[in-house]
Curated annotation (Swiss-Prot):
Binding site for [2Fe-2S] cluster: C67, H69, C86, H89
Pathway: Lipid metabolism; steroid biosynthesis
Keyword annotations of the record: 2Fe-2S, Cholesterol metabolism, Iron, Iron-sulfur, Lipid degradation, Lipid metabolism, Metal-binding, Oxidoreductase, Steroid metabolism, Sterol metabolism, Virulence
Gene Ontology process terms (BP): cholesterol catabolic process; protein homotrimerization; response to cholesterol; steroid biosynthetic process
Catalytic activity: androsta-1,4-diene-3,17-dione + 2 reduced [2Fe-2S]-[ferredoxin] + O2 + 2 H(+) = 9alpha-hydroxyandrosta-1,4-diene-3,17-dione + 2 oxidized [2Fe-2S]-[ferredoxin] + H2O; androst-4-ene-3,17-dione + NADH + O2 + H(+) = 9alpha-hydroxy-androst-4-ene-3,17-dione + NAD(+) + H2O; 3-oxochol-4-en-22-oate + NADH + O2 + H(+) = 9alpha-hydroxy-3-oxochol-4-en-22-oate + NAD(+) + H2O; 3-oxochola-1,4-dien-22-oate + NADH + O2 + H(+) = 9alpha-hydroxy-3-oxochola-1,4-dien-22-oate + NAD(+) + H2O
Enzyme class: oxidoreductase
Domain Rieske residues, every copy: 26-128
Cofactor binding remark: Binds 1 [2Fe-2S] cluster per subunit. Binds 1 Fe cation.
EC number: 1.14.15.30
Protein name, per record: 3-ketosteroid-9-alpha-monooxygenase, oxygenase component
MF GO annotations: 2 iron, 2 sulfur cluster binding; 3-ketosteroid 9-alpha-monooxygenase activity; iron ion binding; ketosteroid monooxygenase activity
Subunit structure: Homotrimer. The two-component system 3-ketosteroid-9-alpha-monooxygenase is composed of an oxygenase component KshA and a reductase component KshB.
Role this protein plays: Involved in the degradation of cholesterol. Catalyzes the introduction of a 9a-hydroxyl moiety into 1,4-androstadiene-3,17-dione (ADD) to yield the 9alpha-hydroxy-1,4-androstadiene-3,17-dione (9OHADD) intermediate which spontaneously form 3-hydroxy-9,10-seconandrost-1,3,5(10)-triene-9,17-dione (HSA) via the meta-cleavage of ring B with concomitant aromatization of ring A.
Amino acid sequence: MSTDTSGVGVREIDAGALPTRYARGWHCLGVAKDYLEGKPHGVEAFGTKLVVFADSHGDLKVLDGYCRHMGGDLSEGTVKGDEVACPFHDWRWGGDGRCKLVPYARRTPRMARTRSWTTDVRSGLLFVWHDHEGNPPDPAVRIPEIPEAASDEWTDWRWNRILIEGSNCRDIIDNVTDMAHFFYIHFGLPTYFKNVFEGHIASQYLHNVGRPDVDDLGTSYGEAHLDSEASYFGPSFMINWLHNRYGNYKSESILINCHYPVTQNSFVLQWGVIVEKPKGMSEEMTDKLSRVFTEGVSKGFLQDVEIWKHKTRIDNPLLVEEDGAVYQLRRWYEQFYVDVADIKPEMVERFEIEVDTKRANEFWNAEVEKNLKSREVSDDVPAEQH
């Protein structure tokens, strides 16, 4: 038997429309040294293709990826001195976007230009500036340095990336306000959760306790405590300071969670980790610790990816109090998709909210206890009865 629900107030999902532009702001393309190999690198981003190369001084340059002569792919070319040479006809393009030389021609069209993208290197990471209006970056929104990344007392970046298709960048931003998904997706108990949005920065403050009914994240996961401060600096680059405690063991680490759009319905998700080197630990053991921690972070990101791959876009989410400031976060995020002159005060004014986690944790702890008791009963049953 089926029920006709027409006309009884059924809430429909409003998927809305995808943005018609890409976010204004700094976007991280990865670890800078990975582009210092003496060859051009292609990057699919912002609905086009970019080429990244280092000049003779080691300065990284980013241009539109297709040659303005006959459309050759510059990322398939070579670096010659301070220019990238097209593989099609050897036209040479400088980091400023100007055509520097056409070797076979009597005259080089020196007024010919391609698009040159503003770049910055911060904490060993390469950034490119995107602005739909073509304005230069405001110094006030420059990505902050991470001093630990240059310290001998911390490990080097361990970096990962994955292409997410069928999902818009906003899906990952929504996680900033999502307290409940830490239990269901990441198997933790968030006992404290707070958001602060102000200017171009959106922050999340979290205390998370490991679930003792979860085995595959480590035998002592139930003893794990995490204090986390995570801030998006602009639309796509998050720095997450992590303070972990496992019983009597403490560790400090910094996680980068960032992305850049490929199309309006796909993006490259990147994450990188540096870990403070424990005093007295060998380089080999420190490297192993860093690798294990990064693998754990990667597992968490891939848990989110599975959701994004199968969910639908929703502009009118139906929320309860514990879901927090989803609409306020989206209002903050909208500032990067409008002209600077159209930024409204409410997009950048300070907004602060602490989510009451008491009711949620009462329910979740009861579920954890139930799972543990079920496990005890199962363990007491002789093997031949399983």
